[in-house]
Amino acid sequence: MTHDTRSLYSQLSSIDSLLHQADIQTLVDGYGQTFIVEHLRKLQEEARIIIRQNNQLPQWHDNWAEELKNRIALQRKAAIKPVFNLTGTVLHTNLGRALMAESAIEAVSQVMRSPATLEYSLDGASRGHRDRAIADLLCELTGAEDACIVNNNAAAVLLMLATVAPDKEVVVSRGELVEIGGAFRIPDVMCQAGCRLKEVGTTNRTHLKDYRNAINENTGLLMKVHTSNYSIQGFTAEVEGTQLAALGKEMNLPTAIDLGSGSMTNLAALGLPSEPMPQDYLQQGIDLVTFSGDKLLGGPQAGIILGKKAWIEAIQHHPLKRALRVDKMTLAALDATLRLYQQPEKMIKDIPTLRLLTRTQTEIHDMAQRLLPHFQAYYGDNYHITISSCASQIGSGSLPIESLPSAALTFAAKDGKGSQLDALAAHWRNLEKPIIGRITDGRLWLDLRCLEDENALIQALSL
């Protein structure tokens, strides 16, 4: 160690002397002495490393309190923060999928603040079942005999397969071996559930006879998987739910369909592309139907299993059910969301997913015109800003080939450099409430379909 290095080390303030500084004492009052001392020690160690490696004091040596305050603020920033979703994808998986209805938010808030009847029966002051109230509501809405709720649709499929067809073959069309995000594949789920996949048909055409010919003494389930995140078009054929249900009844085998997204209302009646509903397959005679809670339903993340009472009871008693069950907050949000489906006249207005999906291009274009002057004031010197027609996506693997006419503010760098667009997108991502758009075709696009609070966006630009 050189004389200069020793001199630099000697200039480092002690913990005790730092704690007597007024600004640091203020931080102690706010966060507690243990917390502050721990962070001061980390700063001291970092300072020693800087001296050892660079033979100089850290830049913040003369203002430990300010550096400490900045470090604490950075550390205490929320890991998950609200953003403006202007990507054009309504159910954006990476941005949290469905927004909650206000009644669902209030319901979650209430059960977080107070004990609740999660597994308590007020009728007999005894233990109840956490799924029961929501199961009754689902049965009322869909005509199912019973229902089960778990933490997502992948869990619903896993639990259903593990209960219905352990150590058995599950017959599925080759064209329905779906992979969802994160390389999560139906064949892999079957393997984890202890089932054996029996592929039938071809990628583009599967017939009822393919299912029939695959049945043997090892068959445990006849299954369909709705290809919600891709579409096979052209020379195609698939087995209808009524056909599969009839074959299952004839051969005394259970039948099931994994809907993936699953809509609880007729989207076509709302002017949207059609998506199969669970109640349709139940009416066709399918024994079990699974789907998601946080996609087209517009509720919290959950997996829902509907179907025959005997099978649902068996599913409820499977050991995996306890590992996959949902908490009181999910159940409260799901309950409140489902109750909105009992009021069709309020449903579209009160469920954000349906409200956003049904917005007209004219409405969105009018919003773009109101916002354009504000963006020009901030960014007009460096960017050409225009209003452009565009196509929104539903997202989360729902209706993959369908799109919704929308409108966007688009930005093109006046110097023609793509790096300027990257810089602008990065700037927006670093705002207190980040603005998330997309760069395509040499422009930065802000699709306004999912924007409902114009003033909040304008305010975000000024921060």
Curated annotation (Swiss-Prot):
Q: What class of enzyme is it?
A: transferase
Keywords linked to the UniProt accession? Cytoplasm, Protein biosynthesis, Pyridoxal phosphate, Selenium, Transferase
Q: What is its main location?
A: cytoplasm
**Which pathway is this protein assigned to?**
Aminoacyl-tRNA biosynthesis; selenocysteinyl-tRNA(Sec) biosynthesis; selenocysteinyl-tRNA(Sec) from L-seryl-tRNA(Sec) (bacterial route): step 1/1
The intrachain disulfides are: none
**Gene3D superfamilies xref list:** 3.90.1150.180, Type I PLP-dependent aspartate aminotransferase-like (Major domain) (3.40.640.10)
Q: Which residues carry this modification: N6-(pyridoxal phosphate)lysine?
A: 295
InterPro entries, alphabetically? Answer: PyrdxlP-dep_Trfase (IPR015424), PyrdxlP-dep_Trfase_major (IPR015421), SelA-like (IPR018319), SelA_trans (IPR004534), SelA_trans_N_dom (IPR025862)
GO MF annotation list: L-seryl-tRNA(Sec) selenium transferase activity
Assembly with partners or alone: Homodecamer; pentamer of dimers. Binds only one seryl-tRNA(Sec) per dimer.
Protein name in UniProt: L-seryl-tRNA(Sec) selenium transferase
Which organism's genome codes for this protein? Proteus mirabilis (strain HI4320)
Q: Could you tell me the gene encoding this protein?
A: selA
